[in-house]
A protein has these predicted regions:
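Short beta-strand-turn/beta-hairpin segments enriched in glycine/proline and small hydrophobics
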Residues: 1-12, 89-106, 131, 139, ...
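Short, compositionally biased
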Residues: 46-57, 143-148, 172-179
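Alpha-helical coiled-coil segments
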Residues: 41-96, 114-117, 139, 183
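Surface-exposed patches in structured soluble domains
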Residues: 19-21, 27-33, 104-147, 152, ...
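Short, Lys/Arg- and Gly-enriched loop/turn segments at beta-strand edges
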Residues: 36-48, 135, 166-171
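Structural microfeature recognizing short secondary-structure transition sites
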Residues: 112-113, 161, 166-208
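Donor nucleotide-sugar binding loop of glycosyltransferases
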Residues: 5, 24, 118, 195
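Short, conserved catalytic or interaction motifs in soluble domains
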Residues: 11, 22, 39, 96, ...
Length: 208
């Protein structure tokens, strides 16, 4: 049994971790803020640029009024407009850099054990935790090549798990594009809804 999605979570930038906002083993939602590295220098830059932006907007307004009365050249007006556009671009860049200091869940799932603490210096290669989407689960199995054409996409199958008496139902959704030349088998995947998240990935299933 395989998770529907799984990823090692890490930051897009480097910095000292100042927040960890998740409990190990808990369910998290897509977009949820999980952790954050220090962004104070970036916030200071943003505040400075926002202050400059207000002044630049005032200059453009005044220059436009003067231009309408032919009291200033077109070139002077275009210069202040360019300065305003540059400031807006700089603000967009800083805001993008600030967003990279935030680690957010890329999808709904269960977050595993954390590998860092507040105060840890993290880089893009630092794994914070693993995020696993366990609903649905993928059931991966292989059939001998002589049966490759017998298992169709959309077909249902039943499987059992060791230690559980009940039978689970999954639906085939994908087939490998070719026969494995070594094992002479075709790998097939089916989806089990796992709506209550009662079954964990990593277990071996017996296909009926």
């Amino acid at each position: 049994l395989l998770p529907d999605e799984e990823v090692d979570l890490s930051f897009e930038t480097s910095g000292k971790i100042i927040e960890i906002n998740f409990e190990e083993g808990s369910f998290v939602k897509k977009g949820q803020l999980l952790a954050k590295v220090n962004d104070r220098p970036l916030q200071a830059q943003l505040q400075r640029l926002v202050s400059q932006l207000k002044l630049a907007e005032d200059r453009v307004f005044r220059q436009n009024a003067l231009l309408e009365r032919d009291a200033v050249s077109k070139e002077a007006y275009e210069q202040v407009k360019t300065e305003l556009a540059t400031l807006n671009a700089d603000i967009d860049l800083i805001e993008s850099n600030i967003a990279q200091t935030e680690l957010r869940a890329p999808f709904d799932g269960v977050i595993g054990l954390r590998q860092v603490s507040v105060g840890t210096y993290a880089s893009p290669t630092t794994i914070v935790a693993k995020l696993t989407k366990i609903s649905p689960l993928k059931v991966e199995f292989a059939v001998p090549e002589r049966y490759a054409n017998d298992v169709k996409t959309g077909a249902g199958l039943d499987f059992t798990l060791e230690g559980k008496l009940n039978t689970f139902h999954a639906t085939v959704y994908a087939r490998e594009s070719k026969i494995d030349p070594v094992t002479h088998t075709l790998t097939i995947r089916a989806l089990y809804p796992n709506t209550n998240s009662a079954v964990l990935p990593g277990r071996y299933a017996s296909i009926k």
